[in-house]
Amino acid sequence: MVNNLHSAHPTGAEYLKAVLSSKVYDVAQVTPLQDMAKLSERLGNKVFIKREDRQPVHSFKLRGAYAMIAGLSAEQKASGVIAASAGNHAQGVALSAKHLGLRALIVMPQNTPSIKVDAVRGFGGEVLLHGANFDEAKAKAIELAESKNMTFIPPFDHPAVIAGQGSIAMELLQQNSQIDRIFVPVGGGGLAAGIAVLIKQLMPEIKVIGVESKDSACLYRALKAGKPIDLDRVGLFADGVAVKRIGDETFRVCQQYIDDVVLVDGDEICAAVKDIFENVRAIAEPSGALSLAGLKKYVKEHNIQGETLVNVLSGANLNFHTLRYVSERCEIGEQHEALLAVTIPEQPGSFLKFCHILGHVPVTEFKYRYADDKQACIFVGVRITGQEEKQTIINQLQQNGYDLIDLSNDDIAKTHVRYMIGGRSNSPLKERLYSFEFPEQKGALLKFLETLGQTHWNISVFHYRAHGADYGNVLAGFQLNDEDLDAFNQHLEKLGYVYQDVTESPAYRYFLV
């Protein structure tokens, strides 16, 4: 390497020097810092968004990739570079190598959507499809790096990559010197580490807040444990930050310089995607909206007013059909919609009476199916202004004698059951309900069904709906006796799909049992 970082664990001053001498602007752009006027008024703070979606590859990843590749020795450059990625890092490496006239080989999992493969090839990268997941692709890339004497370019855990991402912080200070807090998305930690170490060298009074998805919180868990640890599984909606283990160097830097970490869920991310569109007319990928989701939550939880707050739109490489899912979930994430399961008497006029009690509350969704002569279960969505109004509606219904369950935070209800209202089985079943994940690609659902069909247990309920993501989600019920349960779960382990037993879901119990 010929860059300024000669240590595996540089000091803050060494990182600062590396950022100041970085060559990232050979290929990267100085991206705008835009005012989010509507959101600023709503939150009582000055909110700004750093538009990294405006980079040539539509994400910040170009900075770190180019910083490392440009710093290679002439001998290393002559041998070419290799990386493993199914996302933004792949495009950053491909474009960086193309700009420098180098060979770039990107190893991508075999189930990578063709749109992402084509994007890498469009930036001049060679693509090798290998392995069923990222870990297998990465292992192959490291093997090829050794056998072909190519340099492996990691997505986050390298000082040169961290320094490249840190160039964003330098731009922020030049664009607005009055910043109070910067909210940064965290996956492997490269962006958070780069921004934090630079900020704390120059303006340590600025707070740097890491934002993680609740189901991919590798930094939060590492900070609690005092060291990087492996997560058992990660959520895949915000795939750009779906990392099982934070990097060793990124953790060291984040542990030293990050001020706090906030966790958000998928619905809060969806609401942030909507906010970004409404304020600056940009469409962020889920991980790209992560830091804004964290900003909004942090402001509310800590009652922050009158400050200047910055969030980073880290990327905008998303499948268009993901927007359908975002649109459906953003109202719940903004606490503008409540989902309720309500029991009403099965008699003439009871349905109308229920509607009268709701009064002028806007109804967003209403599903009903006759079940028996005694009572009916209805699934109702109502538009609300916040938690207080939701509780008022719940209290009003309960005071009128209705039994109900709030399903607003029930993921099985939001993802599956709301599309399945149609009555219970007429036959009593010994049934267990499972949620499965499988890679989305042509023929993937058929392959899943064929694999699942290898069981001799009867499928009693099934729901699948495409959301434009890299992974699909299926809800399936099986007729199982208690004595079959251990054998069945052992069989599921052998199938290789990520799964979860969700038999105790309130939505399932209310509508499908």
From Swiss-Prot:
It catalyses: L-threonine = 2-oxobutanoate + NH4(+). The modification N6-(pyridoxal phosphate)lysine is found at residue 61. Keywords: Amino-acid biosynthesis, Branched-chain amino acid biosynthesis, Isoleucine biosynthesis, Lyase, Pyridoxal phosphate, Repeat. The keyword Repeat applies. Its cofactor is pyridoxal 5'-phosphate. Residues 338-409, 432-504 form the ACT-like domain. It comes from the Bacteria. Its EC number is 4.3.1.19. Pyridoxal 5'-phosphate binds at residues 88, 187-191, 314. GO terms for biological process: isoleucine biosynthetic process; L-serine catabolic process; threonine catabolic process; threonine metabolic process. GO terms for molecular function: L-serine ammonia-lyase activity; pyridoxal phosphate binding; threonine deaminase activity. Pathway: Amino-acid biosynthesis; L-isoleucine biosynthesis; 2-oxobutanoate from L-threonine: step 1/1. It holds the Pfam family Thr_dehydrat_C. Catalyzes the anaerobic formation of alpha-ketobutyrate and ammonia from threonine in a two-step reaction. The first step involved a dehydration of threonine and a production of enamine intermediates (aminocrotonate), which tautomerizes to its imine form (iminobutyrate). Both intermediates are unstable and short-lived. The second step is the nonenzymatic hydrolysis of the enamine/imine intermediates to form 2-ketobutyrate and free ammonia. In the low water environment of the cell, the second step is accelerated by RidA. Belongs to the serine/threonine dehydratase family. Homotetramer. PANTHER family: THREONINE DEHYDRATASE, MITOCHONDRIAL, THREONINE DEHYDRATASE, MITOCHONDRIAL-RELATED. This is L-threonine dehydratase biosynthetic IlvA. It comes from Pasteurella multocida (strain Pm70). The gene is ilvA.
